[in-house]
């Protein structure tokens, strides 16, 4: 029996074992790469700043500075531009709090970025501690989900960072099946919906994971793992199939029957509210899909489906870079950095080979089986993939980078790893404990020694300051002097030859956001009709005419109403006649 006097000390030690790895990771993997005084931004001049724009747009919207959330003023005058990509509505309030505390736009983004890692780890710890895993098992599983190599490989895509809904939703699905209750069903729906609001990509992949787990759960029930009976095989097979078919209806009926009438009504109201909020979120995406015709061809998706070799690529890891180099290059390789790390692979092999019986075994192999199924379904070999059948489901034709499903699969992988570590720790062998602590240290080092992609915050801000200065100094015909700005001006910025095409587009978006102007420039996951790189001023009339064709406008006055408001910056080939007559 535990000594009551030592319980507080033991609890403190347990919490230290859980949280010290997180703090080390936060310092060495997240904070240190951001440079002294947070001088560096995670990622490059592309998606990082685009996500910063989205978050700032939300902040301006709640302040009343931007009138319509979904009609952000880039790719102007095309509507519903926020729905061209992820919206970050589920996490933008956190950013707004940082902005309200007087942090500037870029620093508030860094704070939002760092908070995401804390929330992911906290969700893991909450779930795994409720399962009563040993502290070191909790730490290793949570560390992998939060700081694992596949997650770091997506640091240029901050929209994929917040995944705290994944462990919470998966845990509630398991708990509901074990002990049905409508509160758990409501909680499951809540975290799924919030995950969609945090990021549509992760939300869709979470639903796929939950669907597979729901199908598997009856097979991993306590009855399924009971001792074999003496019935003939065909009777056992029929009984197993019947139990599998009826399992979920019986669980739902049990949860419903054991709830009071007020509880049932409250459940229906809450689920209806969650459904309505999800419909409100996805409605604009449905709209742009049909109005703009956005969808991904199967050939586009095929490039972004995991290949067998994808799970062995970690080009940014100095530890595994040489091994990754033996894999021949292929299109979109940056999206195929799916190697989970040598430590996790070793833990998985140990868990599969030892099959140590513990109270978590059913849960562990449920998670591992779900990973195996989704890996097989999404895998492409010589152009063939079972995912082609899923691709026809509503919404999935808009998903291009299916490789990102690894970010969701890191949770069930982490659960299985936690189970293995917990089972080994239960053997209470000093030498085995030492090996486990060594494995945890190596897992930390795999992520610490990672070549991060960062951008100078000062350089990014200087780009915007330089663009603002051009508004006042550029000559007429290539830009309008500030004293002669038209009413309600529209910004249009050229691309310097040395710049990647997206950098000046986002420069224009951010400067226009500061000024409260719309801009013809833009960057997103999809592009409107007629979009061209801003290498030539001819994009200006072409984009306006593309908008007119999109809205079925044909009169020259509509063209002139728009172009007379345009302030072009950095172009040398603008024809002054375009401002008085629509070109053919």
Task: Annotate each predicted stretch with a short phrase.
Residues 153-160, 299-300, 304-307, 325-338, ...:
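Membrane-helix boundary/interfacial segments in multi-pass membrane proteins
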Residues 265-274, 359-360, 415, 419-449:
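Signature aromatic-anchored transmembrane alpha helix within multi-pass, membrane-resident enzymes
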């Amino acid at each position: 029996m535990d000594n009551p006097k030592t319980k507080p000390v033991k609890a403190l030690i347990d919490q230290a074992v859980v949280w010290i790895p997180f703090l080390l990771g936060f310092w060495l993997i997240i904070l240190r790469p951001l440079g002294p005084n947070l001088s560096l931004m995670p990622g490059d001049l592309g998606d990082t700043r685009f996500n910063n724009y989205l978050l700032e747009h939300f902040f301006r919207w709640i302040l009343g500075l931007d009138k319509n959330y979904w009609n952000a003023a880039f790719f102007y005058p095309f509507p519903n531009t926020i729905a061209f990509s992820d919206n970050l509505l589920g996490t933008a309030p956190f950013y707004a709090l940082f902005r309200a505390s007087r942090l500037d736009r870029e620093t508030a983004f860094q704070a939002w970025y760092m908070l995401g890692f804390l929330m992911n780890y906290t969700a893991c710890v909450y779930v795994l501690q409720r399962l009563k895993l040993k502290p070191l098992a909790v730490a290793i599983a949570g560390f992998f989900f939060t700081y694992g190599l596949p997650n770091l490989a997506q640091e240029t895509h901050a929209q994929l960072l917040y995944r705290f809904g994944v462990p919470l939703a998966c845990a509630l699905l398991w708990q509901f099946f074990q002990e049905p209750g409508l509160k758990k069903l409501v909680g499951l729906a809540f975290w799924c919906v919030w995950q969609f609001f945090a990021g549509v990509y992760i939300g869709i992949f979470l639903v796929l994971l939950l669907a597979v787990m729901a199908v598997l759960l009856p097979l991993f029930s306590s009855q399924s793992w009971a001792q074999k009976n003496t019935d003939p095989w065909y009777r056992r097979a029929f009984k197993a199939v019947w139990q599998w078919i009826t399992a979920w209806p019986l669980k739902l009926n049990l949860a419903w029957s054991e709830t009071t009438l007020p509880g049932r009504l409250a459940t229906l109201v809450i689920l209806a509210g969650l459904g309505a909020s999800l419909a409100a979120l996805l409605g604009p995406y449905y709209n742009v899909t049909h109005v703009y015709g956005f969808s991904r061809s199967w050939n586009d998706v095929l490039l972004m489906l995991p290949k067998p070799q994808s799970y062995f690529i970690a080009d940014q890891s100095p530890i595994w870079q040489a091994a990754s180099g033996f894999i021949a290059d292929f299109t979109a390789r940056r999206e195929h950095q799916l190697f989970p790390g040598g430590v996790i692979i070793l833990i998985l092999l140990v868990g599969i080979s030892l099959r140590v019986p513990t109270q978590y075994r059913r849960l562990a192999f449920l998670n591992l089986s779900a990973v195996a199924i989704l890996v097989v379904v999404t895998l492409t070999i010589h152009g063939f993939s079972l995912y082609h059948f899923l691709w026809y489901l509503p919404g999935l034709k808009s998903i291009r980078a299916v490789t990102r499903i690894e970010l969701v699969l890191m949770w069930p992988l982490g659960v299985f790893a936690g189970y293995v570590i917990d089972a080994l720790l239960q053997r209470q062998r000093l030498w085995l404990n030492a090996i486990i602590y060594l494995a945890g240290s190596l897992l930390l080092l795999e992520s610490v020694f990672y070549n991060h992609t960062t951008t100078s915050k000062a350089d990014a801000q200087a780009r915007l300051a330089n663009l603002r200065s051009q508004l006042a100094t550029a000559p007429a015909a290539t830009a309008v002097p500030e004293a002669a700005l038209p009413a309600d001006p529209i910004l249009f910025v050229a691309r310097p030859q040395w710049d990647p095409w997206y950098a000046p587009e986002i420069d224009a978006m951010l400067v226009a956001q500061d000024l409260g102007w719309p801009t013809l420039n833009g960057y997103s996951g999809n592009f409107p009709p007629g979009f061209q790189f801003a290498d030539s001023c001819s994009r200006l009339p072409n984009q306006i005419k593309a908008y007119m064709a999109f809205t079925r406008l044909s009169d020259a006055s509509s063209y002139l109403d728009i172009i007379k408001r345009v302030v072009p910056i950095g172009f040398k080939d603008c024809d002054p006649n375009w401002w008085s007559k629509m070109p053919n």
